[in-house]
Amino acid sequence: MAAVGRVGSFGSSPPGLASTYASGPLANELASGSGGPAAGDDEDGQNLWSCILSEVSTRSRSKLPTGKNVLLLGEDGAGKTSLIRRIQGIEEYKKGRGLEYLYLNVHDEDRDDQTRCNVWILDGDLYHKGLLKFSLDALSLRDTLVMLVVDMSKPWTALDSLQKWASVVREHVDKLKIPPEEMKEMEQKLIRDFQEYVEPGEDFPASPQRRTTGAQEDRGDSVVLPLGADTLTHNLGLPVLVVCTKCDAISVLEKEHDYRDEHFDFIQSHIRKFCLQYGAALIYTSVKENKNIDLVYKYIVQKLYGFPYKIPAVVVEKDAVFIPAGWDNDKKIGILHENFQTLKVEDNFEDIITKPPVRKFVHEKEIMAEDDQVFLMKLQSLLAKQPPTAAGRPVDASPRVPGGSPRTPNRSVSSNVASVSPIPAGSKKIDPNMKAGATSEGVLANFFNSLLSKKTGSPGGPGVGGSPGGGAAGASPSLPPSAKKSGQKPVLSDVHAELDRITRKPASVSPTTPTSPTEGEAS
């Protein structure tokens, strides 16, 4: 009362009050002295205090309320934090865990007032649903808007996600043990707001106060229509907003999963039926394309602070749908069913909107090249394990050319025989590490050495062709003349012919000499 006493002495009045009473009939009375203490008029004094108290109470009511809350629920990766950060205008951010707290700045230009709206984001894991007690309690229940976020890039999870998180809210509200009378009042308010929805017109009052007053006057004269059979059957007592994020993925669903317009109408019809049951609004958004982001903010401040908005319902664009609470009904949803060609109204959502099969990409195993020395050591160990080939068996790994050997040099057989020193038959084994060409030459050398050793080792036998012990000199004159022509390669048939000629001479070869297995194989 001391402060009020100081107000009574207008010489020491605060600047705000001095300007308030600087004009008007009350100021005129004060200037004339009729309202001063000398007049002694108690009635005028009471009028003065009434005007002051009325002005103060009006200003306090016009301020934006504090303690309003928005609670976001949805699956992991649905874009809850991204949505709020985009509304805030923040590009870079870090996602929280458990229960995340953010806020929105709310500014009223008409009254030049601002406040903050609390935003609570619950983690998509049901393990964290116990944290709801910190964001939604019995005191803040009346001042809370529930936002259910759905990922439209995965439409097959939309309906299950909405039902799951709505049941989480229902379960939590029941645990708060709100008095039945208070809960009934909240439910009736939600029904009344739904029934009294008016389509935005062209003429809107500039001030939210006047809009509220005008709306109350219109409500007294208007006739409230009854609710539909499927409307507000699951009344939470809280305003609900369903936000479908990532609607830019609709084009991807059309290209990759063969979605058509009737599929998107089918999805929208089921989501709108869910919204009717909870009295919720529906907004399709895209953070990537910045679509309907500001619309979400405007709807929040309209529901929590009574701000006006002039945005009508939008149902034509399949990726920018906006349906405010109270606008929709079963007949309007039935318009979507008229576009069905292959689908039916009674089809189950899970049977039509199914999760596509996961395509497993077959990645070829990367082959790492071994070190050259390691590779050669392994190859050597493999060749060493193979059984050795018989010394006299001609093994030729090279492909044969018709009419001759691929490695036969351009010289006569006699020169080959003469150039090789005599080695006992079977005394030389083929090296498994030797290349194919070297192996062929070694087999031929062993073959001719076995012939020479047999001829020189015969007891008392004269040399072939009249020269004792000189097989090479005796064999040279008897070769066919065709083998000595320049440019002509000797063939294997010449060798067989020479061997046949040697075996036909009984005088040159001893009958007791056993035939070499190598010679038999070669013949």
From Swiss-Prot:
Modified residues (Phosphothreonine): T213, T408, T512, T513, T515
UniProt keyword annotations, A-Z: ATP-binding, Cell cycle, Cell division, Centromere, Chromosome, Cytoplasm, Cytoskeleton, Dynein, Endosome, Kinetochore, Membrane, Microtubule, Mitosis, Motor protein, Nucleotide-binding, Phosphoprotein, Transport
Single biological process term from Gene Ontology: microtubule-based movement
UniProt: ATP binding residues: G74, E75, D76, G77, A78, G79, K80, T81
Entry annotated with the keyword Ligase: no
Record PTM Phosphoserine, positions in chain: S207, S398, S405, S412, S419, S421, S427, S486, S510, S516
Highest taxon in the source lineage: Eukaryota
One Pfam family hit: DLIC
Role this protein plays: Acts as one of several non-catalytic accessory components of the cytoplasmic dynein 1 complex that are thought to be involved in linking dynein to cargos and to adapter proteins that regulate dynein function. Cytoplasmic dynein 1 acts as a motor for the intracellular retrograde motility of vesicles and organelles along microtubules. May play a role in binding dynein to membranous organelles or chromosomes. Probably involved in the microtubule-dependent transport of pericentrin. Is required for progress through the spindle assembly checkpoint.
Protein name: Cytoplasmic dynein 1 light intermediate chain 1
Organism per entry: Mus musculus
